[in-house]
Amino acid sequence: MLEFLRGRDVLVAGWGISGRSLVEPLRDIGAHPVVTDSGAKALAEAAELGLEVATSVELESADLSRFALVITSPGWRPDSPVLVSAVTEGIPVWGDVEFAWWVDQARIYGPVRKWLVVTGTNGKTTTTQMTHAILRAAGIASVACGNIGLPILDALRRNPGPQVLAVELSSFQLHWAPSVRPEAGVVLNVAEDHLDWHGGLDAYAAAKARALVGRIGVVGLDDPVAAALARRSKARRTVGFRVGVPADGELGVVDGKLLDRAFTKAAILAEVGDISPPGPAGVADALAAAALTRAIDVAPQFVKEGLQEHKVGPHRAAFVREVAGVEFIDDSKATNPHAARSSILAHPHVVWIAGGRLKGAAVEDLVEEVADRLVAAVLIGVDAPVIAAALARHAPEVPVVEVRAGDDAVMADDPLRPDEADAVMAAAVRTAAGYARAGDTVLLAPAAASLDMFADYTHRGRSFADAVHALEDGDIGRQP
């Protein structure tokens, strides 16, 4: 499949983590990588490595016929001028995941691996980590890769190489990877997110459904959109999971135990109390990871051991500190309303810190559903007014405070300087602490992306934690 690239030029569109991972594999198959990016710094870095570079502006009006293939960063939209030009000229456009799939199928770096693919609006990283933990417990050489941080190509090039890949894939990556056929793939849930990129919920869901095309497809039955995808699944067999009593062919929960009725008559897999993070969302992720690993015949005892060993990563419903009886929880990874909903519903009394860039997602349903849990809301970021308006409609009795940088700087298109963003977060945390009383939870669950203010969600979470650690007992309950 890759022979057509030998001796040919391949355009690498985007010099990020995925773009960098492409260079050596392209050279290993005899292709000549050419890098394009909209950033001068990125192109300078590529040029310093001896790579041929071209600006995206230059290529928009150039003849692209010299290229046998364009491999795009997952963040590049299909309507990007360079990609549109390539398609118009009949040049195939792949994502780095698509290329990695064919590199694996061609055995460039050893025997073909089993791919266990995880996608969904929320819970992808936790499920991928759980899957990897179970595989490790079973003694299976494996690696967690993809959207979780390690490019798949880098995972394939490891020596000794893994037998199984636990692959987290975003909707962007799946859009550009039509050939991937995983051994098993799961769609955890589907809620409004990245609609500005995909153009609508139907297209977004269709991208997620590309995980359901291999030997085993797995869907989250508690999510109506994901459950509906089961009917469209192209997998040879499709099973479901629910945080409730499972029917035949499902995984679920009975009397506090995770139960498999899909791959055997009935097997206990783990105790709900062993799951990290606790709560329905964590249990759902554990069921998904169990389904993926049971699909490749991992024994129940190793599912149990892996889930017991797994601990939630940073910024995912992570406990930061208790101050004067008030818990402070960092769920900065809750970057959309669906994730924020699960986070808020895990606590009875919440002072909610939210806001950022909503990316076209609606918050009306979220606010209406969690209104009775809210003690107060402290809002930051460019779309704070949108959340404030929803709170005014559906939770008018809840105190709402918008915290902004000076002169509305938070509303600017460019991110704030790190010190400015940290100052806004510190003010938000102090304000939230003032509304909290013993027994309450101050919860950072933004329901929005971070890039209007912060470098990424990890920066936002660190900023929150730093502000929490600066609090004193006297900061609690200062508001009337």
Curated annotation (Swiss-Prot):
EC number: 6.3.2.9
Compartments it resides in: Cytoplasm
GO cellular component, one term: cytoplasm
Alphabetic keyword roster: ATP-binding, Cell cycle, Cell division, Cell shape, Cell wall biogenesis/degradation, Cytoplasm, Ligase, Nucleotide-binding, Peptidoglycan synthesis
Name of one Pfam family that matches: Mur_ligase_M
GO biological process: cell division; cell wall organization; peptidoglycan biosynthetic process; regulation of cell shape
Pathway: Cell wall biogenesis; peptidoglycan biosynthesis
InterPro entries: Mur-like_cat_sf (IPR036565), Mur_ligase_C (IPR004101), Mur_ligase_C_dom_sf (IPR036615), Mur_ligase_cen (IPR013221), MurD (IPR005762)
SUPFAM superfamilies on file: MurCD N-terminal domain, MurD-like peptide ligases, catalytic domain, MurD-like peptide ligases, peptide-binding domain
Catalytic activity: UDP-N-acetyl-alpha-D-muramoyl-L-alanine + D-glutamate + ATP = UDP-N-acetyl-alpha-D-muramoyl-L-alanyl-D-glutamate + ADP + phosphate + H(+)
Highest taxon listed in the record's lineage: Bacteria
Alphabetized GO MF terms: ATP binding; UDP-N-acetylmuramoylalanine-D-glutamate ligase activity
Major location category of this protein: cytoplasm
Binding locations of ATP: G120, T121, N122, G123, K124, T125, T126
HAMAP family in UniProt: MurD
Family: Belongs to the MurCDEF family.
Protein name from the UniProt record: UDP-N-acetylmuramoylalanine--D-glutamate ligase
Organism of provenance: Nocardia farcinica (strain IFM 10152)
